[in-house]
């Protein structure tokens, strides 16, 4: 009986390692990484909301894909897939309040944090919502996602 449980435990561990699941990350580390991601997403949202009306209205014409249902850290792959288009839109609409260097730094921070949170696994296939989102809706949705995951960890 014990052999069977041990073998099951080993098999499960191998599956987790094979799928690059973040096995060594403690809950506290995950919380800290989520806090960092939340901070960076909020900074982006604040930067977007501080644009003058013409630039903001131009940015709102770009549409982003959001997942149908994001409930787990693996769903961060969907955010990772939309980071490049997000970065390009932000570059197009830079302002004196939100410089290229700020955008690059925030996007780099987000990329690093996402990699830590979701692991290096990219086989997860995102199921996107049929409707696209504006840049502010997109950022708000991911902020809400992070807050939701964070609340389950506390």
UniProtKB/Swiss-Prot annotation:
A Pfam short name: IL2
GO terms for biological process, alphabetical: adaptive immune response
Subcellular location: Secreted
Listed GO CC annotations: extracellular space
Cited SMART domains: IL2
Alphabetized InterPro entries for the sequence: 4_helix_cytokine-like_core, IL-2, IL-2_CS
Major location (coarse): secreted
Disulfide bonds: 78-126
Signal sequence bounds: 1-20
Gene Ontology molecular function: any one: cytokine activity
Function statement: Cytokine produced by activated CD4-positive helper T-cells and to a lesser extend activated CD8-positive T-cells and natural killer (NK) cells that plays pivotal roles in the immune response and tolerance. Binds to a receptor complex composed of either the high-affinity trimeric IL-2R (IL2RA/CD25, IL2RB/CD122 and IL2RG/CD132) or the low-affinity dimeric IL-2R (IL2RB and IL2RG). Interaction with the receptor leads to oligomerization and conformation changes in the IL-2R subunits resulting in downstream signaling starting with phosphorylation of JAK1 and JAK3.
Protein name: Interleukin-2
Organism: Mirounga angustirostris
């Amino acid at each position: 009986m014990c052999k069977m449980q041990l073998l099951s435990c080993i098999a499960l561990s191998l599956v987790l390692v094979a799928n690059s699941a973040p096995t060594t990350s403690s809950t506290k580390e995950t919380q800290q990484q989520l806090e960092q991601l939340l901070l960076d997403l909020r900074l982006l949202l604040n930067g977007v909301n501080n644009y003058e009306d013409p630039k903001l209205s131009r940015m709102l014409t770009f549409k982003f894909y959001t997942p149908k249902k994001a409930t787990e850290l693996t769903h961060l792959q969907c955010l990772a897939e939309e980071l490049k288009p997000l970065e390009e839109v932000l570059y197009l609409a830079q302002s004196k309040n939100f410089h290229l260097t700020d955008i690059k730094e925030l996007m780099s921070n987000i990329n690093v944090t996402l990699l830590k949170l979701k692991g290096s696994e990219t086989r997860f296939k995102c199921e996107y919502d049929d409707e696209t989102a504006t840049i502010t809706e997109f950022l708000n949705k991911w902020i809400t996602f992070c807050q939701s995951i964070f609340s389950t960890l506390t």
